[in-house]
Amino acid sequence: MKAIWLFVLFAWFSPAFSAGGEALSFPSNLQHGQAPAVVILFSLPDCAYCEKVRQQSLRHIHADPGYRGRVAVYEIDFSDSKRSFTWFDGNRYTGKSLAGPLNVKFSPTVMVFNAKGTAAGKPLLGASLPEF
């Protein structure tokens, strides 16, 4: 788990990865524990910094077959009050209803969880860009 967290930190600050595109996968049910580590990008619509984090860091982990089954990467719009998903504890949430309990107030926020839903370290806030 520590190695995955270090990779996320490295990738977060690395300009080496770039790929464009839409949002990452939206979780439907996190209770099933599809991977030992779960990385979640909490984003807002039209957030340019969220797109940078998505492009420069998380899309690489999401697409790399070497991480399949080891790391799941998702994106949740924490202003969304319509789409719901099952959290690790079995309760249903929307991005908006989960933001409060997790203290997500800033976009982008990246959090890493183990398969049981325990946070693996402090959230990463913001982006590693000179203008940020």
Language model: regions and residue ranges:
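Thiol-based oxidoreductase modules, predominantly thioredoxin-like and allied folds used
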Residues: 66-93
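Short pre-active-site segment immediately N-terminal to redox-active cysteine/selenocysteine motifs
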Residues: 43-47, 54, 106
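Hydrophobic beta-strand anchors of alpha/beta hydrolase catalytic cores
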Residues: 39-40, 73, 110
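Short active-site neighborhood of thiol/selenol oxidoreductases, capturing the structured segment around
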Residues: 33-47
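Sec-dependent signal peptide recognition
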Residues: 1-8
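Typically the conserved alpha-helix immediately C-terminal to a functionally engaged Cys/Sec
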Residues: 51-66
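N-terminal "domain-start" segment that seeds a small globular fold
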Residues: 10, 14-31
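Non-catalytic, surface beta->alpha helical segment in thiol-disulfide oxidoreductase systems
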Residues: 100-101, 105-132
